[in-house]
């Protein structure tokens, strides 16, 4: 299933490329900002030192922020099984949502449709195990809540995105 993206590169990423076989995980996030505009501003501000590989906007548009073979700075201090600092082994997908601090909403149907298309493509391209599709809260539970309880994990699992 093909997906279309626009480009709005973030300056915050590791300049050294990784190998395709190093990508083992997909990590889902919500932006946690008051507005989509504020989220994009933060993700494209060098001083923020945060980024993601993809951003899915409220209307379902997918924006490439950091190309897949570059390491985006989305996971921070993180741990999953034998992996630490998951940035180097994962693709980070931010989904526009104000999050718990700013009136956490359901994710739009357009966002979920785009997330399914993008995730299926990444799973196939990088041979990602469905058990390695995680939320930020899974890999950093002491400090992160996203993508949160309104994230449709069960629905995505029925679409072969993740595990329920």
Question: Where do the protein language model's features map onto the residues?
Answer:
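Structured loop/turn residues at beta-strand edges in well-structured enzyme cores
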Residues: 21, 88, 128
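Structural preference for beta-strand elements that scaffold enzyme active sites
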Residues: 25, 90-92, 132
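Conserved beta-strand segments that form the floor/walls of ligand-binding pockets within enzyme
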Residues: 55, 92-94, 134
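N-terminal catalytic cores of peptidoglycan-degrading enzymes
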Residues: 1-84
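Basic/polar, cationic surfaces and motifs that engage anionic cell-wall
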Residues: 4, 84, 98-99, 103-164
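Conserved, mostly hydrophobic/aromatic
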Residues: 28, 93, 115
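Residues immediately flanking
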Residues: 30, 95, 137
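Short coil-to-beta-strand
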Residues: 84-95
């Amino acid at each position: 299933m093909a997906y279309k993206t626009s480009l709005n590169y973030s300056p915050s990423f590791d300049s050294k490329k990784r190998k395709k076989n190093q990508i083992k995980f997909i990590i889902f996030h919500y932006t946690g900002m008051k507005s989509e505009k504020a989220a994009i501003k933060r993700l494209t501000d060098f001083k923020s030192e945060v980024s993601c590989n993809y951003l899915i906007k409220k209307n379902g548009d997918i924006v490439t922020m950091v190309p897949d073979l570059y390491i985006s700075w989305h996971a921070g201090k993180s741990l999953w099984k034998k992996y630490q600092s998951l940035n180097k082994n994962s693709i980070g997908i931010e989904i526009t949502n104000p999050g718990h601090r700013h009136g956490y909403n359901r994710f739009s149907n357009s966002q979920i449709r785009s997330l399914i298309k993008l995730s299926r493509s990444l799973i196939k391209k990088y041979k990602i195990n469905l058990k390695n599709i995680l939320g930020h809260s899974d890999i950093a539970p002491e400090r992160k809540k996203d993508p949160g309880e309104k994230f449709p994990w069960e629905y995505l699992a029925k679409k072969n995105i993740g595990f329920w």
